[in-house]
Amino acid sequence: MKTSMQRKLDQLSTRLAELNDLLSRENVTADLDQYRKLTREHAELGPVVEQYALWRQSRSDEAAAQELLADPSMRDFAEDEIRSAREGMARLETELQKMLLPKDPNDDRNIFLEIRAGTGGDESALFAGDLLRMYLRFAERQRWQVEMMSESASDLGGYKEVIVRIAGQGAYSRLKFESGGHRVQRVPATETQGRIHTSACTVAVMPEADEIGEVEINPADLRIDTFRASGAGGQHINKTDSAVRVTHIPTGIVVECQDDRSQHKNKDRALKVLAARIKDKQYHEQHAKEAATRKSLIGSGDRSERIRTYNFPQGRMTDHRINLTLYRLEAIMDGDLDELIGALVTEHQAELLASLGEAD
């Protein structure tokens, strides 16, 4: 293990001991915000220090076995112990490297998931609906909460655009690699000749701002229009201008919300989505220079980049960033994304480790 890494782990061990002391004091809950901060830090450091303790134990085991080598009767036993200890140290060191990787500050945030139909007309809109169902089924498996923020339905079903808020532990860290172009190849229900059509949708995963105030938005930069919500009519036809369109003039970002009958609620939702879009734009601009110097295969989140193909006739899904093909499309479309997401996270960790190695 590198000296710099060992020094870092020693510092974390010392810090954990300090946290244990602070959390054992009688007045620790006097300041609840500080208490939550300390318990969160303790929860993050605990597993790292525990792994480091196991690594140090393996190192001690190796040192003890080295001393036995001088005894001919113990040589075979000692060599087995040394080999076992070194294998354990190598495995633990790899785990510790991953644990020490820079943490994405957005990983613990809730998200806004935006799906837009692209090329392919009605078929693209139908596929947008299929993608939404896929993510909602995945969210259901994770016991995450889902809230519809905005939807623009197409005539034949599906969506021209849909935005949902997903709240739950790990929402952003698990879904952040879904941003990009999603292509589908299949025979549309309206196709009489049995020809395979290709269409596409774009997905954007945006971390939710803790508070709207976290993103600086000058009210003078906003144009807010109200209009009558579109609907199928009938007894629930919306007779008031409850739908809201918010335009952020400096960036040209436009958000519409019309799902609620309350204009106030629609405006509140639109401002939350707008804050997330501005934050997302700032994040990508900030990382553009880094991306230019070190091409990341999966971390760019560029919506124009085609990241995945869903081929229904062959029952396969291919993620082009990591050259992964899975022949279990039906399960994937039903929200079984663990294998795919796990592979993307592993590749991202490998990229981070490689970049840290270059920095060293």
From Swiss-Prot:
Keywords, sorted A to Z: Cytoplasm, Methylation, Protein biosynthesis
Protein modification: Methylated by PrmC. Methylation increases the termination efficiency of RF1.
Gene Ontology CC annotations of this record: cytoplasm
Modified residues (N5-methylglutamine): 235
Subcellular location field: Cytoplasm
Major subcellular site: cytoplasm
One term of GO molecular function: translation release factor activity, codon specific
Statement: the UniProt record of this protein carries the keyword Secreted: no
Database matches in InterPro entries: PCRF, Pep_chain_release_fac_I, Pep_chain_release_fac_I_sf, Prokaryotic/Mito_RF, RF-1
NCBIfam families: prfA, PRK00591.1
Function field: Peptide chain release factor 1 directs the termination of translation in response to the peptide chain termination codons UAG and UAA.
Family, as annotated: Belongs to the prokaryotic/mitochondrial release factor family.
HAMAP family membership: Rel_fac_1
Protein name: Peptide chain release factor 1
Originating species: Burkholderia cenocepacia (strain ATCC BAA-245 / DSM 16553 / LMG 16656 / NCTC 13227 / J2315 / CF5610)
Lineage of origin: Bacteria, Pseudomonadati, Pseudomonadota, Betaproteobacteria, Burkholderiales
Gene behind the chain: prfA
